[in-house]
Amino acid sequence: MAAGMVTVAAPAEAASTPSGACGSGYYLIDQHALGSVADIYLFYNGSSNCAVTWVRSPNGTRTYDLRVQIERKSDLVVAPDGGFYKYYAGPVKIGAANTCISWGGSAEGIRWASGWTHCG
C-alpha cells in the first residue's frame, strides 16, 4: 500500500480477533476502552496504521452503533468506518510514515479520540 493510501476493508467473513481484522503483519501498539461495550485497538505494520472498534461480548444477534477512524496529521486525510455492526467496526487503514495520527471512535454513544500521537 502506498504511503498516501486510505482503505476501509469489509472482510467476507468476520474476523475472530481484533488483529485478525487488520490482517497479517500488524502488531498492537495501543488500545482504549469505550465503557463496558467495546474497545478500540490500534495496530501498526511498519508503514500503515489499522484501527478496529471491537465489541467485548457480542451475542451474535444484537447490532451495536460502532465507529472507528484514523486521521493523518500531514494532510488531514481521514479513514472512517461506522454503522450498526454485530462484532466490530473497521478495519480502517492509513499510511502514516513520518507523521502523527489521531485515532478514536465510539460504541453506543461513548466516544473517545486520542489527539495527535504515535508520531514517526
List where the protein language model places each region.
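Post-signal peptide N-terminal regions of Sec-secreted extracellular proteins
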Residues: 14-120
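Secretory targeting and sorting signals
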Residues: 1-14
